[in-house]
Every structure is written in structure tokens, then in C-alpha cells.
Amino acid sequence: MTNMMKALVKAKPEEGLWMERVPLPEIGPNDVLIKVRKAAICGTDVHIWNWDEWARKTVPVPLVTGHEFVGEVVDVGSAVTEYRIGQRVSGEGHIVCGHCRNCRAGRGHLCRNTLGVGVHRPGAFAEYISLPQHNVVAIPDDVPDEIAAIFDPLGNAVHTALSFDLVGEDVLVTGAGPIGIMGALVAQCVGARKVVITDINPGRLALAKKLGVRHVVNAREEKLTDVMRKLGMTEGFDVGLEMSGSASAFRDMIDVMNNGGKIAILGIAPTGFEIDWNKVIFKMLHLKGIYGREMFETWYKMIALVQGPLDISGLITHRISADDYREGFAAMRSGEAGKVVMDW
């Protein structure tokens, strides 16, 4: 093994990413060195490519990007006991402090000192990545590499969907991006009654239908009240999963929620927006923000789901070499792709 590797780097404070040779990551006593097999492009990576306001405020330059991956252990620190060389693994992309109140209470996903892999520290768009052993997750033999490579966004979907009891409930998902589609499929898998997903992008809606979401709605062409009437719903949705970051979608969701309904909010809006808080109050709605994955309960549940009834393979629309990364980012930026997985 040489001391240099190929990596996709945010090398300059401007639009784009660049393939460069960078030093191999060093590992400490508690770290695991992983040879990356496959890595997927996330919406966060697109923000970093675009160098938008969030990226400019958040991402240090230069930085190896990427955080959705699967790979193989090639070296371990002297204190690592849980992982062995040759083992297939992925990793939790949020590095937590371990000493704040939430971490000490077992709520690491709420750590106030979280560092993001590929956002604050070197990431997975590289031949190798180093992670603390606490963040490494073993991948079962019956889970394919390309599915393990998208566990990070699947975890977002699972965390959001399983925030509330869904058995026998009517569920509205706003936003048919990859995470929204996976959230809808999870809801169906665990026993929701009616699951409706909305978007205004025909390509995304077609992908949702292809993957098996039962009720797919173009919000520009059909009113949710009409959809509810067709489905025999008389009182509104019990659970909402907001995956779009769209002000109009969120307002529409509030309008059609049943009294006492629960909304899990993962979609990030580009700017702040107003909602009618009187509706939230008088409907007695429960709003819950979602960030990342519960460590590590979400990982256990999503692995069990893909080993069982949940098939998300159709969500991967582009399989490319890492050298063709520009093509992959173009597909993601077009809004027409599902998941783009790169071979390293």
C-alpha cells in the first residue's frame, strides 16, 4: 500500500469537485482503515459541489468529500477489538463527542458537537477512509455492496418513518426524492394502511411508482382532498413525513392532517417560511424534527428491513466509475436521478 490515494476533493472555494492525489488517512489506536468499494452521491454532496450558502458557511477547503459508502477493513488501530481485516463494513457518518448530556444518555444522534464525515472531516469519496471503530458498522453477507452503500440515506428514511407508530395509520409523504420514496416503502412494509407520496417532478413520481409506492400524486395536478376522497379517507392523515423542504408541500400537509396527527420533518428548506400556527395549535399536531440516524438502533432496523421485505435496489438509477464523477453529479443536479453509486 502506498502512502497516497485517489480522492474527490473540494479543493477550491468555488463550484465543482476535483479528483486529486492525497495522503492516505492515518489511523489512531481506536480507528479502522477502510478500503472503499462503492460510494453514493448525496444531496449534501450536491450542495458542496454547487458551493451554495450552506456549503460556504460549513465546509473547510480543501476537504475530501462524501459519506455514503461500503468497503473492506484493511487495517485497525491497536485498541480495536470489534473488527478484523477483510471484514465488509459501512459507517455512521456523524462523529459524536461522547461526553455531552445527550451522548452520555445514549442519544448520540442529538450530540451538539457532531462532526460530519465528508462535511467537517475527510470523507468517503476516496480509495480509503479512516473512522473511529464506534462508527463502523458490519455488513451481513446477504446485503449487496450497492445497497450497503446507500444505508446512510436509507437510515434517514427509516429514522423519519419509524418516529411514530404506523400500523394501520394513513401516511402522507411529501417529497419523492430517494429518501421520500424509501420512507414511503418503509411505511408500507411496517403496516401503514394508506401511504400517499406527493411531488411535482414527474420523473421522481414515476420512480416512486416503479418501486411500488401504492399512491403517487402529482401535487400540481391533483388536490390532496380529492385523493383522500378517492381512497375513502374521511378524517385526514394520521402521520406525515415531510421530505421535500417545500413550503407549499408542508402547508398542504398541515391542512390535511387529522386532529392529533404527527409530522416528522426531515426536508430542509432553502430559506425560512411561514406556516399557519393556529392550524397546528387547534389540530393539536405533534411536529418532530429529524436529523441523521439514531445510533445505532436505526442501523439495526434498516439492516433487518433490507434482509426482509424492503427492496430498494430499483432506487439506484446510475452505476458509474468514480472517474466519471462529473457524469454522476450532472445526473444528481438534474433532479432526474434516483441514487448514483460510484465504483472506487
Curated annotation (Swiss-Prot):
Chief location of this protein within or outside the cell: cytoplasm
GO biological process: L-threonine catabolic process to glycine
Pathway given in the UniProt record: Amino-acid degradation; L-threonine degradation via oxydo-reductase pathway; glycine from L-threonine: step 1/2
PROSITE patterns: ADH_ZINC
Protein name: L-threonine 3-dehydrogenase
Record note on cofactor: Binds 2 Zn(2+) ions per subunit.
UniProt-annotated binding residues for Zn(2+) 2: C97, C100, C103, C111
Oligomeric and partner information: Homotetramer.
Binding site for Zn(2+) 1: C42, H67, E68
Annotated catalysed reactions: L-threonine + NAD(+) = (2S)-2-amino-3-oxobutanoate + NADH + H(+)
Residues of the active site: T44, H47
Superkingdom classification of source: Bacteria
